[in-house]
Regions:
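Conserved beta-strand segments of alpha/beta enzyme cores
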Residues: 111, 272-274, 358
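Switch I (G2) and immediately adjacent beta-strands of P-loop GTPase domains
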Residues: 54-67, 72-76, 256-284, 302-305
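Short glycine-/small-residue-rich Rossmann-like dinucleotide-binding loops
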Residues: 244, 279-280, 304, 311, ...
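A glycine-rich (often HGG/GG-containing) alpha/beta subdomain
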Residues: 1-149, 153, 157, 333
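Short beta->alpha junction loops/turns
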Residues: 25-26, 94, 255, 312-313, ...
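C-terminal-of-GTPase-core extension/linker across diverse P-loop GTPases
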Residues: 2-10, 14, 148-267, 284-286, ...
């Protein structure tokens, strides 16, 4: 990536809207926009005060045609999103206007930004670290208020400060040890292996404290996948509609109505839940329905929690017995549906076939048992409602993995000390932990890995 060129991209989602935004960043941002922006003020944008808003029109530099009436927002570096000169052109929303303005900018020598390049520039220019850059994606993807709160705290630098404090303690220890190893003749107080061990113990405790937040953090960030499975006409779609409190899935008496999986998000006591209504599982010669059945089985394998809906008004079918065997000993809820009708299956009959988290009698069509389902899901994932915290929290798999590896390196150094290994070997493990922590914030991460991470971003961000 070249930081000496100027980039542009549409920053708003495609479609019809009140406002469309084209973002421009780089050393020529003010000059390029100035060539196409006409306002009553004769002062060039580059000479105007930063963090100001200006009204005018975008005019094609070759044809003289007015493209749109706009507002231009001027933010000069380093006090901008990218820490470079940034100009945002706010025009009328829609497909045509934003594209035409972007085309004119590109014709003036500006380069089309890559995915995530604005945020990547903010990172490379030192305005944010990698955890904060990733938090921006998490804010965009947040499904609940709690997951948003976790992401905002991370963007504010809560996690970064915690990691940097750990790194500072480790590098101070490394520096002292390496000086005593490299310059034994100097009058520097030598540190014993036992003193190193004593110094590492509180650092390991802090790592354990942070790792203890990982399950809760990941849950708030990613949520849980709940797959609703069962035979056709068991009431899966009725259950989904009752949970969503809307008619999202079509409900009929015809078996095989749901031929593909329907996916929705909802929040249950602060937990983002990815709810998937799958096709009814049965033997069928219908090609489309059989594809839906296969997908249902795939979701069964991937699910964090399986909800098996059984029509309690009919005797247990062979396919249902097979499904019960498949989900036994997994986080699972068995719903004996159609409680408003005469029941042919008792809870005891199901319990005899395996170990399940909960067996509940409901009537999805009548909306009975929905509160109980919410309680069961919540207790399954965390033993109660999950709240965000203002403290540092691990929620990203990459961060969790690197923190575990860093702790493992320090554990190795403790073992090396207890085994009487020389100090220079002990320092190697401590330095490895320091570098792994740097990978979390991006201070020691390879450029290729940085490139890969920013590919997750959209254009214009």
């Amino acid at each position: 990536m070249f930081l000496d060129d100027t980039i542009a991209a549409i920053a708003t989602a495609p479609g019809i809207g009140g406002i469309g935004i084209i973002r421009v960043s780089g050393p020529e941002a003010c000059d390029v926009v100035n060539r196409i922006f006409h306002s009553k003020q004769s002062v060039p944008l580059g000479d105007r005060q930063t963090r100001t808003i200006h009204y005018g029109h975008i005019v094609h530099p070759k044809t003289g045609k007015t493209l749109d009436e706009v507002i231009v927002v001027l933010m000069k570096g380093p006090h901008s999103y990218t820490a470079e000169d940034v100009v945002e052109i706010q025009c009328h929303g829609g497909f045509v206007s934003v594209r035409e303005i972007l085309k004119v900018l590109l014709s003036e020598g500006v380069r089309q930004a890559e995915e995530g390049e604005f945020t990547k520039r903010a990172f490379l220019n030192g305005r944010i670290d990698l955890t904060q850059a990733e938090a921006i994606i998490d804010i965009i993807d947040a499904k609940t208020e709690q997951s948003l709160e976790v992401a905002v705290n991370q963007l504010d630098g809560t996690l970064s400060k915690y990691i940097r404090a750990l790194r500072d303690e480790l590098i101070a220890m490394i520096a002292h040890l390496e000086v005593t190893i490299d310059y034994p003749e100097e009058d520097i107080e030598e540190v014993s292996a036992q003193e190193v061990r004593t110094g590492l113990e509180p650092i390991l405790e802090k790592m354990d404290t942070l790792l203890a937040t990982a399950q809760r953090g990941k849950l708030l960030r990613d949520g849980v996948m709940v797959s609703i499975i069962g035979r056709p006409n068991a009431g899966k779609s009725s259950l989904m509609n009752a949970l969503l409190r809307e008619d999202r899935a079509i409900v009929t008496n015809i078996p095989g109505t749901t031929r593909d999986s329907i996916e929705e998000f909802l929040t249950i006591q602060g937990i983002p839940v990815r709810l998937i209504d799958t096709a009814g599982i049965r033997e069928t010669e219908d090609i489309v329905e059989s594809m839906g059945v296969e997908k249902a089985r795939q979701y069964l394998d991937k699910a964090d929690i399986v909800v098996l809906v059984i029509d309690g008004s009919k005797p247990l079918e062979p396919e249902e017995q097979e499904l019960l065997q498949l989900i036994a000993n997994r986080p699972s809820i068995i719903f004996l549906n159609k409680a408003d009708q005469m029941q042919c299956i008792m809870k005891e009959e199901i319990a005899a076939l395996g170990t399940f988290t909960e067996i509940v009698t409901i009537s999805a069509a009548q909306g009975e048992g929905m509160d109980e389902m919410a309680k069961v899901i919540t207790s399954l994932v965390q033993g109660g409602s999950v709240q965000a915290s203002h403290e540092a929290m691990l929620s990203n798999v990459r961060h969790i993995t690197l923190m575990e590896q860093a702790k493992s390196s320090l554990d190795q150094s403790i073992l090396a000390i207890d085994s009487g290994m020389p100090i220079d070997l002990i320092v190697t493990d401590i330095r490895a932990a320091w570098e792994l922590l740097g990978d979390i914030t991006g201070e020691s991460l390879r450029e290729s890995m940085v490139d890969e991470l920013f590919k997750r971003f959209c254009l214009g961000k």
